[in-house]
Design a protein with these regions (language model features):
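Extracytoplasmic mature domains of secreted/periplasmic and thylakoid-lumen proteins
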Residues: 1-40
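Residues that flank catalytic or metal-binding motifs in active/ligand-binding sites
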Residues: 2, 178, 227-229, 244, ...
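Structural recognition of the beta-strand scaffold that forms the well-ordered cores
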Residues: 4, 13-15, 180-183, 232, ...
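Solvent-exposed loop/turn segments at secondary-structure junctions
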Residues: 13, 22, 187-189, 253-254
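Short coil/turn segments at secondary-structure boundaries
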Residues: 17-21, 83-88, 183-185
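Aromatic-residue-lined binding/catalytic grooves and analogous aromatic/hydrophobic interfacial grooves
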Residues: 38-147
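Long, positively charged binding patches that form subdomain-scale interaction surfaces
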Residues: 153-228
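Conserved catalytic-core surface of thiol
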Residues: 234, 239, 244-309
Length: 309
């Protein structure tokens, strides 16, 4: 989804468009937008009973302008994709550079497959998502209804595979020095202060003398678990050929975990990791061929799309 935004609107250096306060403290902004959207949805439903399609379209446009106003006030006006900016910087060799360019052209230069390589032989444009959703058949392509943020953008799809396939791809990428984006349910059996993610972190069964035995599929079906947060895998500890624990880079500042890094047990990965973004060269043809399928469309409220809304 971020790739669609970059392709349409471009990029600017962070120094020229730094984060506003609300970008790092977004709870109030998200709550306000959600409240406004719910109010607008009720109004549109009421208007649909007696108004024409043209009237509804006009009302919807006005509502979207108000949402845009809220975002602009709280985050600042976004850079125009076609307006040139000036950027001065020093490269790693202390050589001075000056650039005058539009955000779209800047993004196009950075998006050149010859220029953007996170590792030798890895094209960031070819990366795709693997998911582990045991509710649905493996080796099938999945998507979520209305999951997309840009008209005519690249569709958001997932290749559903067993966890061993995901782990093997992640290990191979890490060994090549490539960090791995992943989506998980961070709220279960994790502690942000210590930076530990482990299914054995809390022994609720011992403490309360109860049994907690839902499977991963059952947790998804009941809403007990869903993708809520994205992080990055940067290292893995392997014993006797099997992963034992993973190093995770989080985005909650250096105050969380060990200077922003967490340790995730392999058991936690089995139960609460749902998505990874991988290079096709690290999976089999059987997996990449799934991308040619017509996707199974999951409903709008499905947990597999939760972290992307």
């Amino acid at each position: 989804m971020a790739a669609n935004l970059v392709q349409k609107y471009g990029l600017v250096p962070q120094t020229l468009y730094p984060d506003a306060f609300n970008a790092q403290n977004s709870a109030t902004m998200r709550r306000l937008i959600t409240t406004k959207l719910r109010e607008d949805a009720l109004r549109l439903r009421d208007l649909a009973k007696s108004s024409s399609a043209e009237k509804l379209a006009t009302e919807k446009e006005q509502m979207l302008q108000e949402i845009h106003l809220i975002l602009t006030v709280m985050l600042g006006p976004p850079p125009s994709p076609s307006k040139e900016f000036n950027w001065e910087y020093y490269d790693k060799d202390k050589k001075f550079h000056q650039v005058t360019i539009t955000p779209k052209d800047f993004a196009a230069q950075l998006s050149d497959p010859k220029a953007v390589k996170v590792s030798d032989g890895t094209d960031v444009h070819s990366l795709f998502s693997l998911v582990n959703d045991p509710r649905n058949p493996y080796y099938r392509l999945l998507t979520v209804d209305h999951l997309g943020n840009v008209v005519d953008g690249r569709p958001v799809t997932y290749v559903n595979v067993p966890m061993p396939i995901i782990k093997d791809a992640c290990i191979s990428m890490i060994k090549r020095g490539i960090p791995v984006f992943f989506g998980s349910d961070i709220g279960n059996y994790s502690d942000s202060k210590s930076g530990i993610m482990d299914t054995k972190l809390y022994d609720y069964e011992l403490g309360f003398n109860v049994q907690l035995g839902m499977t991963k599929a059952e947790r998804l079906m009941t809403g007990e678990s869903q993708m809520t947060h994205a992080m990055v895998l940067t290292a893995v500890h392997i014993e006797d050929g099997k992963p034992v624990r993973w190093r995770v880079e989080n985005s909650w500042s250096e105050d969380a975990g060990t200077k922003g890094y967490f340790v995730m047990s392999d058991g936690w990965m089995d139960e609460f990791v749902y998505q990874t973004v991988v290079d096709p060269s690290f999976v089999s043809k059987e997996v990449t061929d799934v991308l040619k399928q017509e996707p199974i469309v999951l409903p709008l409220w499905d947990p597999m799309g939760k972290s992307l809304y």
